[in-house]
UniProtKB/Swiss-Prot annotation:
Its EC number is 2.5.1.-, 2.5.1.1, 2.5.1.29, 2.5.1.10. The gene is GGS2. Dimethylallyl diphosphate binds at residues 157, 235-236, 275, 282, 292, 302. GO terms for molecular function: (2E,6E)-farnesyl diphosphate synthase activity; dimethylallyltranstransferase activity; geranylgeranyl diphosphate synthase activity; metal ion binding. This is Geranylgeranyl pyrophosphate synthase 2. InterPro entries: Isoprenoid_synthase_dom_sf, Polyprenyl_synt, Polyprenyl_synt_CS. Mg(2+) 3 binds at residue 278. Mg(2+) 1 binds at residues 148, 152. The keyword Disulfide bond does not apply. Geranylgeranyl pyrophosphate synthase; part of the gene cluster that mediates the biosynthesis of gibberellins (GAs), diterpenoids that may provide a selective advantage during infection of the preferred host plant, rice. Gibberellins (GAs) are diterpenoids and are synthesized via the mevalonate pathway. Biosynthesis of the major metabolite GA3 (gibberellic acid) from geranylgeranyl diphosphate (GGPP) requires 13 steps.
């Protein structure tokens, strides 16, 4: 490989008019075998260069050949000034971080930070570790938003241009992936090696849940309500559970395994409530229209729980026909979306979803009450957060 590099370099110069020679040091990155015995080898069979060994090579240069400085820039010298190296690292860090820093400037409700603080009432994790957990969950959440917006072709995020429409899809996805890797690196600082496999398994579950959601959309497959809930438990619930998992691994509280299991169930239930509520609000809330666009989920082809119920109860197949036009047109018109909402209302799907959310909210509150009894500690912070998410009727 190194000999081929040298050969390629030689072709850049006019050897026929060479009048001087330049000696450079080639630093080898991989072991390769000489065709001839190296000077310091006693073997007649040929030797080898070990990793990072050096070999001095004479290169003929013409009168008009590039200067030695140019040659050194062609990766034949690993020497680099500390100033140049610092500038390069600073620039690459700025470029890699820019899309992520952009999404951090967008308005946020701070739900996940408040959620972690509320769980910590019971788990008593030290402040330093709690800060890392908040940062990690924020990194995973925001990087997933960057990816989601690109996958869904969403032009807006929280009322501002989506990250991929500002930096381009390639740069946005590269940064999102980069941030996920950085998050996992930070997780390694606060959990032991034995627990790391379980933690990364939870992160993997998030992507698997998202994969199912995307697959249904791409192939126009209408999932059952049970399948939808399983997907939500993976896609959204897993990130909520990851918060609990990281807190539990760093907890200084005396909390029983049964209490942790009950807390995990409550957290999964809250994750389901959160996703169903978010999808429902996308259909009926004017604030969501300002932030994301009018019924944007319908443009994306996403199967929300409300839409699944409406399709199951639509004997006229009107919804099926309208949704098929999205695949033809690329998106639905405002009038088509209004017709979808009309069918949902007529079929009782909007009311059904609203009632279901009310029941889920009641169950979450009941789980909190049960945990307060078992832990002998009230959790006003978690109660306040759940009340904040309560659907206004």
């Amino acid at each position: 490989m190194a000999e081929q590099q040298i050969s390629n370099l030689l072709s850049m110069f006019d050897a026929s008019h060479a009048s001087q020679k330049l000696e450079i040091t080639v630093q080898m990155m991989d072991t390769y075998h000489y065709r001839e015995t190296p000077p310091d080898s006693s073997s007649s069979e040929g030797g080898s260069l070990s990793r990072y060994d050096e070999r001095r090579v004479s290169l003929p240069l013409s009168h008009n050949a590039a200067s030695p400085d140019i040659v050194s820039q062609l990766c034949f010298s690993t020497a680099m000034s500390s100033e140049l190296n610092h500038r390069w690292k600073s620039q690459r860090l700025k470029v890699a971080d820019s899309p992520y820093n952009y999404i951090l400037t967008l308005p946020s409700k701070g739900i996940r930070g408040a959620f972690i603080d509320s769980l910590n009432v019971w788990l008593e994790v030290p402040e330093d570790e709690t800060s890392v957990i908040k940062e990690v969950i924020g990194m995973l959440h925001n990087s997933s938003l960057i990816i989601d917006d690109f996958q869904d072709n969403s032009p807006l995020r929280r009322g501002k241009p989506s990250t991929h429409t500002v930096f381009g899809p390639a740069q946005a996805i590269n940064t999102a992936t980069y941030v996920i890797v950085k998050a996992i690196e930070k997780i390694q600082d606060i959990v032991g090696h034995d627990a790391l496999a379980d933690v990364t398994g939870t992160i993997t579950t998030i992507f698997q849940g998202q994969a199912m959601d995307l697959w249904w959309t791409a192939n126009a497959i209408v999932p059952s309500i049970q399948e939808y809930l399983l997907m939500v438990n993976d896609k959204t619930g897993a990130l909520f559970r990851l918060s609990l998992e990281l807190l539990a691994l760093n907890s200084e509280a005396s909390i029983s395994d049964s209490a942790l299991e009950s807390l995990s169930s409550a957290v999964s239930l809250l994750g389901q409530y959160f996703q169903i509520r978010d999808d429902y609000m996308n259909l009926i809330d004017n604030k969501y229209t300002d932030q994301k666009g009018f019924c944007e989920d319908l443009d994306e082809g996403k199967y929300s729980l409300t839409l699944i119920h409406a399709l199951q109860t639509d004997s006229s197949d009107l919804l099926t026909n309208i949704l098929s036009m999205r695949r033809v047109q690329g998106k639905l018109t405002a009038q088509q979306k209004m017709l979808v909402l009309e069918v949902m209302k007529t079929n009782g799907s909007l009311d059904w979803t609203s009632k279901l959310l009310g029941m889920l909210h009641t169950r979450v509150v009941a789980e909190i009450e049960s945990l307060e009894v078992s832990t002998k500690r009230d959790n006003h912070a978690l109660r306040a957060l759940v009340e904040r998410l309560k659907l206004e009727t």
